[in-house]
UniProtKB/Swiss-Prot annotation:
Location of N6-acetyllysine modifications: K3, K522, K571, K835
The name this protein goes by in its record: Matrin-3
Cellular component GO terms held in the UniProt record: nuclear matrix; nucleus
Species classification: Eukaryota, Metazoa, Chordata, Craniata, Vertebrata
Record's keyword terms, sorted: Acetylation, Immunity, Innate immunity, Isopeptide bond, Metal-binding, Nucleus, Phosphoprotein, Repeat, RNA-binding, Ubl conjugation, Zinc, Zinc-finger
Domain RRM intervals: 398-473, 496-571
């Protein structure tokens, strides 16, 4: 190469130019590059070499005209046959800088590869002063350029420079349109000679890299339009074999710098970006592959790959950079030239999940289609785009799009709270696998107000910032087809059930928990799960529930030394009977029966209530069977009709019954600390030959289930008396246990149809029993407080279940010692043994 430089220098001296060796060598390289039409920024082998030649000809002064340059090239070619054969410039005439010629793309690629240069390296080399470039230090300069290129990584071209040869066939504007659009150019290349002076004769130390890069970027619009004038259908055949080389070069440079580095490489520009940038900005489908994204400088080879690319975060980030580089460009401004073909936007596969949001829907625009993918003028500044910050067409959408949130408990509530202050929410949709949500407001103004607010104020979900913008892809959210008549109600959707967690396992009554929620409103129902240390409290209105949740978020709720976590239950909307109609009917029967029977004058109202309730109680054996199914299996139905009539109290969500085995067991377990609050003794009998009466079924309740039944009692008119008795039962568990004894006796009588009599008849039967001799196994001595009796009736279940008293205990010692030593247990056992003795006597008589 040194010999070539010397020969070139001799040739130039013979013409009288007096140029030194380095100037002649660089001038020859620039002329060769000009003849081969090597690209600078777009990667196309067609345009831009004239500018490169002028930049690389450092040996020539600014006054050197084009004819002088040709003379220098001619003398150099006569003294070097090798270079003449390589560059093929011996017979070429003067080439004006603004003219366009096709070059041999194969030779151009080989020359660049032999020098180790790329299009960017040529531009960088042009910035060096001529006195610092010599044949000796030229290799070191090129190595420095390569090293700097590797460190910096590839830059975004945005149609400016650095484009590789992997561009698709250029879709060019017709010449007549191109001539009309030339008013966008400030001057032709011939008239812009003075503007080249800062590039040709500048002090290297006084100019920054950005300013030089800015000067080079000024040529892009002209060169892009000039390049699009020449249509060549055989372009792919000439350049397809260069794909791997330039792509590998792109890989060496790195796939993309960080956002801060990208921003540092560009200055703000006026006007609009080139048409190719605008097309790729909108994500329009290319008409041919392979296609090179003019924004990301990345080749794609199929529709699927193109869709994946424009949906990626890198493309979205660089689209945002394009908007920052051209602040005056408004993609959504519907004045001037538009994107014509209304069907092109329908073909777009870009949902734009990144920072730009989804693309706008299809719309009809006027004007003939000029560009390859729409009506795109050459460099006009008013074009449509998916820029969500603009407000050109937002009036047609009322769907707020929320993105990049983190999932957690009560996610729906957190999302709806973002937009609820701005208006009524009509519908919403939360995606399962993607962290995106769509919330439809009642009016467009409400949706726009929410979006405008969160453009200046950060939107937080679980304390983390999220992105909120107006969805232009979705204008409405359709109602589910299966529920066309279902009216969406946000308040009903959220429910009014408060979830309390981290409660103590024991040592408190149900009323103590209810007092936590009483200050915020009326309590309709509740279920307490001591085994799980949690409780569900249903308030009368959602506002009451929200008031408690909001207050506890600001000030922690402490209960018996524990910080109780309070939130709105998303799983359960309300607390209802599993079979609501049957449960209400039974409760009505319970009320009517309680009023129809006249108790003895000596009996208290609690005794009367217990007896009337007990008349609906099923047989002990049947109660045992159903208790096992409820405690162990948690199933909704059992094998017999009587069990199906039992309206167990369970939690119910909006769509289905959401209760599992553990929850059902927890419901039963919670009754130990407050005694038999149900007053409906579901006795378990070891005997299986007791008869059943279907009409006398009753609701078996544990303490939490009894509390749940309050909701249904309140829904039935004229049963306030029973509610008051239940509330009294919550405050005094021992009293409830005592009141249950007569109920057990009545239930035992109800098991046998022959003994379906009044309380007076029951008393006479008890007197008649004493006239007969009772076997020893049915005898029981006087009550002793510390002597447990009937331990065999306590069996292990999910806890320890007393079949006589229908109570669960988690501790065996408490069940067999404390409970079996209690007076209610003793009385029930005594009456149960008397019943067995009476049955035996009747059998002997028959």
């Amino acid at each position: 190469m040194s010999k070539s430089f010397q020969q070139s220098s001799l040739g130039r001296d013979s013409q009288g130019h007096g140029r030194d060796l380095s100037a002649a060598g660089i001038g020859l390289l620039a002329a060769a590059t000009q003849s081969l039409s090597m690209p600078a920024s777009l990667g196309r082998m067609n345009q831009g070499t004239a500018r490169l030649a002028s930049l690389m000809n450092l040996g020539m002064s600014s006054s050197l005209n084009q004819q002088g340059a040709h003379s220098a090239l001619s003398s150099a070619s006569t003294s070097s046959h090798n270079l003449q054969s390589i560059f093929n410039i011996g017979s070429r005439g003067p080439l004006p800088l603004s003219s366009q010629h096709r070059g041999d793309t194969d030779q151009a690629s080989n020359i660049l590869a032999s020098f180790g240069l790329s299009a960017r390296d040529l531009d960088e080399l042009s910035r060096y002063p001529e006195d610092k470039i010599t044949p000796e230090n030229l290799p070191q300069i090129l190595l420095q350029l390569k090293r700097r290129r590797t460190e910096e990584g590839p830059t975004l071209s945005y149609g400016r420079d650095g484009r590789s040869a992997t561009r698709e066939p250029p879709y060019r504007v017709p010449r007549d349109d191109w001539e009309e659009k030339r008013h966008f150019r400030r001057d032709s290349f011939d008239d812009r000679g003075p503007s080249l002076n800062p590039v040709l004769d500048y002090d290297h130390g006084s100019r920054s890299q950005e300013s030089g890069y800015y000067d080079r970027m000024d040529y892009e619009d002209d060169r892009l339009r000039d390049g699009e004038r020449c249509r060549d259908d055989s372009f792919f055949g000439e350049t397809s074999h260069n794909y791997h080389k330039f792509d590998s070069e792109y890989e060496r440079m790195g796939r993309g710098p960080g956002p801060l580095q990208e921003r540092s490489l560009f200055e703000k520009k006026r006007g609009a970006p080139p048409s190719s940038n605008i097309e790729d900005f909108h994500g329009l489908l290319p008409k041919g592959y392979p296609h090179l994204c003019s924004i990301c400088d990345l080749p794609v080879h199929s529709n699927k790959e193109w869709s994946q690319h424009i949906n990626g975060a890198s493309h979205s980030r660089r689209c945002q950079l394009l908007l920052e580089i051209y602040p005056e460009w408004n993609p959504d401004n519907d004045t001037g030239h538009t994107m014509g073909d209304p069907f092109m936007l329908q073909q777009s596969t870009n949902p734009a999940p990144g920072i730009l949001g989804p693309p706008p829907p299809s719309f009809h625009l006027g004007g003939p289609a000029v560009g390859p993918r729409g009506n795109l003028g050459a460099g006009n500044g008013n074009l449509q785009g998916p820029r969500h910050m603009q407000k050109g067409r937002v009036e047609t959408s009322r769907v707020v799009h929320i993105m990049d949130f983190q999932r957690g408990k009560n996610l729906r509530y957190q999302l709806l709270q973002l937009v609820e202050p701005f208006g009524v929410i009509s519908n919403h949709l939360i995606l399962n696998k993607i962290n995106e949500a769509f919330i439809e407001m009642a009016t467009t103004e409400d949706a726009q107000a929410a979006v405008d607010y969160y453009t200046t104020t950060p939107a937080l979900v679980f304390g983390k910032p999220v992105r909120v913008h107006l969805s232009q892809k979705y204008k409405r959210i359709k109602k589910p087809e299966g529920k066309p008549d279902q009216k969406f109600d946000q308040k009903q959707e959220l429910g009014r059930v408060i979830h309390l967690s981290n409660l103590p396992h024991s040592g408190y009554s149900d009323s103590a928990v209810l007092k936590l929620a009483e200050p915020y409103g009326k309590i309709k129902n509740y279920i307490l799960m001591r085994m799980k240390s949690q409780a569900f409290i249903e308030m009368e209105t959602r506002e009451d529930a929200m008031a408690m949740v909001d207050h506890c978020l600001k000030k922690a709720l402490w209960f018996q030394g524990r910080c109780v976590k309070v939130d709105l239950s998303e799983k359960y909307k309300k607390l209802v009977l599993r079979i609501p109609n049957r449960g209400i009917d039974l409760l009505k029967k319970d009320k009517s029966r309680k009023r129809s029977y006249s108790p003895d004058g000596k009996e208290s109202p609690s005794d009367k209530k217990s007896k009337t309730d007990a008349q609906k109680t099923e047989s002990p054996a049947e109660g045992k069977e159903q208790e096992e199914k409820s405690g162990e299996d948690g199933e909704k139905d059992t094998k017999d009709d009587q069990t199906e009539q039992e309206p167990s109290m369970l939690l119910e969500s909006e769509d289905e019954l959401l209760v599992d085995e553990e929850e059902a067991a927890a419901l039963l377990e919670s009754g130990s600390s407050v005694g038999d609050e149900t007053d409906l003794a579901n006795l378990g009998d070891v005997s299986s030959d007791g008869k059943k009466e279907p009409s006398d079924k009753a609701v078996k309740k544990d303490p939490s289930a009894s509390a749940t039944s309050k909701k249904k009692l309140k829904k039935v008119d004229k049963i306030e008396e029973l509610d008051q008795e239940n509330e009294a039962a919550l405050e005094n568990g021992i009293k409830n246990e005592e009141n249950t004894e007569p109920g057990a006796e009545s239930a035992e009588n109800a098991d046998d149809p022959n003994k379906d009599t009044s309380e007076n008849a029951d008393g006479q039967n008890d007197e008649n029993k004493e006239d007969y001799t009772i076997p020893d196994e049915y005898r029981i001595g006087p009550y002793q407080p510390n002597v447990p009796v009937g331990i065999d009736y306590v069996i292990p279940k999910t806890g320890f279940y007393c079949k006589l008293c229908s109570l669960f205990y988690t501790n065996e010692e408490v069940a067999k010692n404390t409970h079996c030593s209690s007076l209610p247990h003793y009385q029930k056992l005594k009456k149960f043994l008397n019943k067995l003795a009476e049955e035996r006597r009747q059998k002997k008589e028959t």
